[in-house]
């Protein structure tokens, strides 16, 4: 699953129209995309918009009705006039362009008429009276959504291996490391809703903490646990995460190389090291085959010497799962990287009337 185009109207400062993710040379959907532009141009807004629309799609698949007022995606999406995301397919269910859409009725109808090549799966439109209507494109083909909907349920309700893509959204402002204060070291399960839409959520509770999830991974998938630890350790200088956990302690320790019996907790790592842990772990742990990874400023807090190797590791993780990576950055070195091996998109903003 890869995004091939995004359509916006009145979404933050973004200009109205199409944002194409098709490579200009190969005419294929690009698997690595960089969004650039000055502060306030809408880079972060666009990533959040995609994540919110995917979150809404989960509700539409489950309930087959409009989002309730209490749903966080509704509160955010209803601020804009229109948003549509077109994928090259959602394998193994749809092997042709499919789309999700939400917006004002007139804009939605115009977009549908202009893009008959897209199979629109579901969405919502809002009339002039502010009445919201579920766009049920399933009427002429009963059961068209059901296989995808059933796989989503298996994703969020079971630990089964499921052949269905997901979306990972890692917001820059949310990626703050907070030491746990409640229920520390308790054996608590991961929230399976992360298998549909993965986000990093700041919490002082042990449940949901990266460290707690990493320890759970050792119990459930030992081979992947050691693989993740190896990936993380390559970015730590003069130290390494000890994969062995002392019985009764249920905490991970970071050993200092060359110093016997000297260690500290994950909480004591630097801000840049925490960023590396968050990015690599969440992608390694939760990305489904064919998934999409959205990262707002992956170079945040990082020393310039680490940025290239971190991006290479993330790109490899996404490539191994046949997915798509979309990031934002202000770093010129990152711009050059994606101009040479990917697609860099300079976002356009609306021109306000004088």
List PLM regions with ranges:
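P-loop NTPase switch/coupling surface
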Residues: 1-202, 219-224, 231, 237, ...
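Conserved D-loop-proximal element of ABC-family nucleotide-binding domains
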Residues: 303-304, 308, 337
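Extended helical coiled-coil dimerization/tether regions that scaffold
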Residues: 2, 9, 182, 188-269, ...
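H-loop/switch region of ABC-family ATPase nucleotide-binding domains
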Residues: 328-330
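Loop/turn-to-beta-strand initiation segments
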Residues: 289-291, 322-326
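Walker B catalytic acidic pair
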Residues: 296-298
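Conserved hydrophobic alpha-helix in the ABC-type ATPase nucleotide-binding domain
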Residues: 279, 310-314
């Amino acid at each position: 699953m890869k995004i091939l185009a995004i359509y916006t109207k009145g979404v933050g400062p973004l200009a109205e129209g199409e944002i194409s993710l098709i490579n200009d040379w190969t005419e294929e959907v690009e698997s690595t995309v960089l969004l650039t532009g000055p502060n306030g141009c809408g880079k972060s807004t666009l990533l959040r918009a995609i994540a919110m629309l995917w979150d809404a799609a989960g509700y539409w698949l489950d309930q087959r009705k409009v989002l309730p007022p209490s749903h966080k995606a509704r509160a955010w999406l209803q601020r804009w006039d229109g948003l549509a995301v077109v994928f090259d397919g959602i394998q193994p269910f749809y092997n042709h362009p499919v789309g999700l859409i939400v917006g004002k009725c007139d804009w939605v109808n115009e977009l549908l008429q202009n893009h008959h090549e897209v199979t629109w799966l579901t969405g919502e439109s809002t009339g002039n009276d502010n009445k919201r209507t579920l766009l049920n494109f399933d009427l002429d083909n009963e059961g068209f959504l059901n296989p995808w909907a059933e796989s989503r349920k298996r994703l969020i309700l079971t630990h089964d291996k499921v052949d269905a893509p997901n979306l990972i959204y890692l917001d820059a402002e949310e990626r703050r490391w907070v030491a746990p204060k409640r229920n520390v070291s308790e054996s608590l399960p991961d929230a399976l809703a992360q298998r549909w839409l993965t986000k990093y959520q700041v919490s002082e509770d042990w449940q949901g903490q990266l460290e707690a999830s990493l320890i759970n991974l050792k119990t459930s998938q030992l081979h992947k646990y050691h693989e993740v630890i190896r990936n993380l350790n390559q970015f730590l200088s003069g130290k390494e995460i000890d994969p062995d956990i002392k019985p009764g302690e249920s905490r991970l320790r970071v050993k200092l190389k060359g110093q016997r019996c000297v260690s500290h907790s994950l909480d004591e790592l630097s801000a840049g090291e925490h960023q590396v842990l968050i990015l690599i772990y969440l992608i390694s742990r939760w990305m489904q085959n064919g998934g999409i990874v959205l990262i707002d400023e992956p170079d945040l807090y990082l020393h310039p010497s680490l940025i290239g190797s971190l991006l290479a590791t993330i790109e490899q993780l996404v490539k191994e799962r046949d997915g798509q990576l979309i990031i934002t950055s202000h770093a010129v070195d990152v711009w050059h990287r994606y101009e040479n091996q990917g697609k860099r998109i300079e976002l356009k903003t609306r021109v306000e009337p004088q």
